UniProtKB/Swiss-Prot annotation:
EC class: ligase
UniProt entry keywords in alphabetical sequence: Aminoacyl-tRNA synthetase, ATP-binding, Cytoplasm, Ligase, Nucleotide-binding, Protein biosynthesis
Molecular function terms, GO-annotated: ATP binding; glutamate-tRNA ligase activity; tRNA binding; zinc ion binding
Name of the protein: Glutamate--tRNA ligase
NCBIfam families noted in UniProt: gltX_bact
CDD domains (alphabetical): GluRS_core
Quaternary structure (record): Monomer.
Family, per entry: Belongs to the class-I aminoacyl-tRNA synthetase family. Glutamate--tRNA ligase type 1 subfamily.
Amino acid sequence: MTSSSVRVRFCPSPTGIPHVGMVRTALFNWAYARHTGGTFVFRIEDTDAARDSEESYLALLDALRWLGLDWDEGPEVDGPYGPYRQSQRTEIYHDVVAKLLTAGEAYYAFSTPEEVEARHIAAGRNPKLGYDNFDRQLTDSQRAAYLAEGRKPVVRLRMPDTDLAWHDLVRGPTTFAAGSVPDFALTRATGDPLYTLVNPCDDALMKITHVLRGEDLLPSTPRQIALYQALMCIGIAERVPEFAHLPTVLGEETKKLSKRDPQSNLFAHRDRGFIPEGLLNYLALLGWAIADDHDLFSLDEMVAAFDVADVNSNPARFDQKKADAINAEHIRMLDVADFTARLRAYLDTHGHQLALDDAAFAVAAELVQTRIVVLEDAWALLKFLNDDRYAIDPKAAAKELGPDAGPVLDAAIAALDGAADWTTADIEAALKTALIGGMALKPRKAFGPIRVAATGTTVSPPLFESLELLGRERSLGRLRSARDQVGSP
């Protein structure tokens, strides 16, 4: 097999909100396809009408597009093996089931769960062992009798009487002993196909060569291999694909990250202001590393280096602090103009409007780019520029606007009132001359009261630049208002 013939797939069910573990799986499949020059197939497994929703389907499209994980075949781009939504492939599955039955690879099973348990108990076995392959040997007359009773059978695959083994690209040689996996259902009693059928069936028909998926699906692999072998017998499959079971993503306290964990929600990270580069970089580290000596890399660098054989089999813990730190580094790496555009779009989306023209907004964006972890942080630093969001924090006032601040504010007001031009350089020169030179104050004592008076907080973008953005009139107005609230020393 040549590298360019590699075909991988990402096949989520449209239920709920995209999960970061699911996105990690999509990323590894996408990166492997791009690294090998192969094909990334996006398929929707929407056979569960009770749980699937159009809203979740659209959320999946939104997630992949936001992350920049483009697909070569799938919804809205089509391809040679469509349709790519399983709900539109029902007739295909019915045809495959019919061929499996005709070839003797599958059979009708009429046993109820209660009957299976009763047989286990009668034989002295654990009643929870699962299906016992009883219906394999039914005669035509027995089947006819069950049908006459009105029973609706399921279709089960006839499992081989041999070990099922494969070389997992992440975990190495893996074997399930003969007889350890019972014959399993391919359809419901209604005739509707089950996931156990449609997933391998679509992989075969779409000529998938490598299945990269979560470790939680490993127990289903022997069933799928057996089905691939049966599909090869009836001319549906060309091969059994190679498998790679990716490590489990853990949350707090080494428990598997679940949909109930806040870190699992992809859109919660986006809403906080993660950028795709930062989130993808971090998710790539959940089971893979580009090198031992650094964790920061671009998506292009990942594509150049990624090999599924290098994925670690050990569970990976989602560390929010590390994810935040990596995102902060990627924000700093952005071109200033790119960052400015992304920040403007983020603030607009979240209803945060700054009373700044484009030029002033660009200045403000550059001031905060190296001071934030996620885009959300920028609003906390810049909202003082809006008069309707400006208020002096009581804790900041208690720290910086005590009686000793009165003379400092008086001197600052006088110095700024006399500044010839309202530029960062002129503001800095005027304040340093008056407060550090004239009053012999240390910078923290000199500028702390001014920062709190002008921005309402002890944490802000650089002071002199902030005053320039505020403008002369608003800056002096806030300083005078703060001075009026400060008592005499």
